[in-house]
Amino acid sequence: MTHGFDKDFWERHWQQGPGSMGGNPPNPYLARETSGLTPGTALDAGCGGGAEAIWLASHGWHVTAADISSEALARAAERAATSGASERLRWVEADLSVWRPDERFDLVMTHYAHPAMPQLDFYHRIAGWVAPGGTLLIVGHLHTPGSTGHGHHPLAEASVTSAAVTARMDGMDWEIVTADEHFRTLTGDGGRAVPLQDVVVRATRRR
């Protein structure tokens, strides 16, 4: 399988203007899944325009936000400058298929991030960056029978199921808290309805 989600792909994506969704509000699952957590250190793996990272920082977390696109990070930092939480944010330009952080985090999250590697391998990789007792939050595109694609993303590379994600987690190491699949609609450019099919997995690392 080939993977087109390289740096050039994401720089083009973020240079497209409003359609790249840099000004969108944070993902609605974020508040629901983290409301009971004590703020600590967090990694946003594939932070894009920074909405989720900024939201976390605004709620007391110290966030490392990593993305392969310098254009995305520039937009995110500009947005953060008016948030009142920029001192709790660190922006890192990184290829998440090869980069490794120098610490583990109380929360590792990713929202619709697609590096140049198989999707499930990516989730397995970032799971290793969660500290004992910490939380992994994955929000991704749901693969459903009969689907033909999700936006500009090749379906086979961009979508998963909750069962496929949790199957990669050793039951001795993880407690699965959430493993949901949702269908929702958001308003896109020009007021058009955009259907989304989401996978939401939250797990706590036991050790």
Describe these PLM feature segments.
Residues 69-71:
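Conserved SAM/SAH-binding beta-strand->alpha-helix loop
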Residues 1-37, 40-48:
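Conserved class I S-adenosyl-L-methionine
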